[in-house]
């Protein structure tokens, strides 16, 4: 091999050095890098799996949120409807009470008016009786007897009352 220009001991030493270097690189560099790449690949896969789980959880939470929101809306609408019904019932009840009070006040007012009317009529009867007596005395020129006088006055007043 000397003819080719290759030195055999140098070639063997280079082959041994290359194998030793390949072994050392494989042991200390290639395997740790490969292990690191596998670990990284595993972490990425786990992260993707976790991301998918989180995405599914978010979808469930979102669905739960929407369901609860719909339930809250239904409950709110129910509460509003019930409040409106109670308000209508209270309004009707208050109207009945107000009408009853108004009728009662009107009845009391009518009673008072009638009572005052009767008092005024009694007062007018007394005045009318004395005026009639006085007028009759002046016209007749004498006093009427008390018994006849009272009967005549009451008869006249009754006739006037029937005309009104």
From Swiss-Prot:
Keywords linked to the UniProt accession: ATP synthesis, Cell membrane, CF(0), Hydrogen ion transport, Ion transport, Membrane, Transmembrane, Transmembrane helix, Transport
CDD domains in UniProt: ATP-synt_Fo_b (cd06503)
Gene Ontology annotations for the cellular component aspect, listed alphabetically: plasma membrane; proton-transporting ATP synthase complex
Signal peptide annotation: none
Recorded topology in the membrane: Single-pass membrane protein
Transmembrane segments: 10-30
InterPro entries reported in the protein's UniProt record: ATP_synth_B-like_membr_sf, ATP_synth_b/b'su_bac/chlpt, ATP_synth_F0_bsu_bac, ATP_synthase_B_chain
A molecular-function term among this protein's GO annotations: proton-transporting ATPase activity, rotational mechanism
Compartment annotation: Cell membrane
Cited function: F(1)F(0) ATP synthase produces ATP from ADP in the presence of a proton or sodium gradient. F-type ATPases consist of two structural domains, F(1) containing the extramembraneous catalytic core and F(0) containing the membrane proton channel, linked together by a central stalk and a peripheral stalk. During catalysis, ATP synthesis in the catalytic domain of F(1) is coupled via a rotary mechanism of the central stalk subunits to proton translocation.
Subunit structure: F-type ATPases have 2 components, F(1) - the catalytic core - and F(0) - the membrane proton channel. F(1) has five subunits: alpha(3), beta(3), gamma(1), delta(1), epsilon(1). F(0) has three main subunits: a(1), b(2) and c(10-14). The alpha and beta chains form an alternating ring which encloses part of the gamma chain. F(1) is attached to F(0) by a central stalk formed by the gamma and epsilon chains, while a peripheral stalk is formed by the delta and b chains.
PANTHER family attached to this UniProt entry: ATP SYNTHASE SUBUNIT B, ATP SYNTHASE SUBUNIT B', CHLOROPLASTIC
Family under the similarity heading: Belongs to the ATPase B chain family.
Protein name: ATP synthase subunit b
Species for this entry: Herpetosiphon aurantiacus (strain ATCC 23779 / DSM 785 / 114-95)
